[in-house]
């Protein structure tokens, strides 16, 4: 037995098929357009969480500097990122006297060179704490700085720990020691205060970092906020990623806090 479709029946079938094709095509186009947007939104959320975690870490080590916290742990949701203390920047202190925290306390990343009487150069290879996620790198180097796809973002998330009064420039530096590296969805990092030492007889200091321009602007801002500058720049061009600040009308006090990370 043969069945014959009239013109109206054929039109309904074709119309239904066209509707299905249009719906499937539209869904595909929406997916293609929206997928990068959704992925970018997820990356931004993960980045913001990493920034928040690094800011909380800064608060932790600041408490350790002042002795109000000795050891603690923190769980961090990395969502595919990584965290390590493998990188460092160079910090050199020129002082007339080694502080008690360094006398008789050798460390492989500290090199004290006695040039002459009352002239000591202390080279400190200061390890930073870094989070890498979604093409960005968040670096804790006293301040919290960012690199985006290999380029330095000139605006810091958090300024370096610099305080300037009319008679003293205070600078806090944090050195993360150990051999820490972790990655994945969720990690745990342990912090333990190793020691804090204070350089009080500083004639000058030199800092070499890829974030030199940010450091320079932070020092300029802090020094310009007081009528009498206790210290001033000796080298500020950052051509070789280096700045040097010398004692002027006041004093320089540098607080080094060494934190073990595991």
From Swiss-Prot:
It comes from Archaeoglobus fulgidus (strain ATCC 49558 / DSM 4304 / JCM 9628 / NBRC 100126 / VC-16). It is a single-pass membrane protein. The keyword Transmembrane applies. InterPro entries: DUF7289. Its main location: membrane. Keywords: Membrane, Transmembrane, Transmembrane helix. One of its GO terms (cellular component) is membrane. The chain crosses the membrane at residues 13-35. This is Uncharacterized protein AF_0759. It is found in: Membrane.
């Amino acid at each position: 037995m043969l069945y014959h479709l009239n013109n109206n029946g054929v039109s309904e079938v074709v119309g239904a098929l066209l509707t299905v094709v249009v719906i499937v095509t539209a869904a595909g186009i929406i997916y293609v357009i929206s997928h990068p947007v959704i992925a970018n939104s997820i990356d931004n959320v993960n980045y913001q969480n990493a920034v928040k975690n690094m800011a909380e870490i800064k608060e932790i080590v600041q408490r350790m500097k002042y002795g109000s916290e000795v050891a603690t742990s923190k769980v961090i949701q990395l969502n595919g990122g990584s965290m390590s203390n493998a990188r460092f920047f160079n910090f050199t202190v020129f002082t007339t006297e080694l502080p008690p925290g360094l006398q008789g306390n050798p460390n492989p990343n500290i090199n004290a060179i006695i040039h002459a009487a009352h002239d000591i150069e202390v080279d400190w290879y200061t390890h930073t704490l870094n989070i890498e996620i979604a093409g960005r790198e968040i670096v804790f180097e006293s301040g919290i700085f960012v690199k985006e796809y290999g380029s330095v973002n000139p605006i810091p998330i958090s300024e370096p720990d610099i305080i300037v009064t009319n008679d003293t420039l205070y600078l806090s530096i944090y050195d993360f020691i150990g051999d820490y590296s972790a990655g994945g969805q969720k990690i745990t990092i342990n912090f333990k205060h190793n020691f804090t030492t204070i350089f009080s007889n500083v004639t000058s200091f030199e800092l070499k970092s890829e974030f030199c321009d940010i450091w320079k602007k932070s020092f300029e801002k802090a020094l310009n906020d007081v009528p009498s500058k206790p210290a001033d720049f000796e080298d500020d061009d950052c051509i070789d990623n280096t700045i040097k600040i010398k004692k002027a009308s006041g004093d320089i006090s540098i607080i080094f806090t060494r934190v073990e990370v595991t």
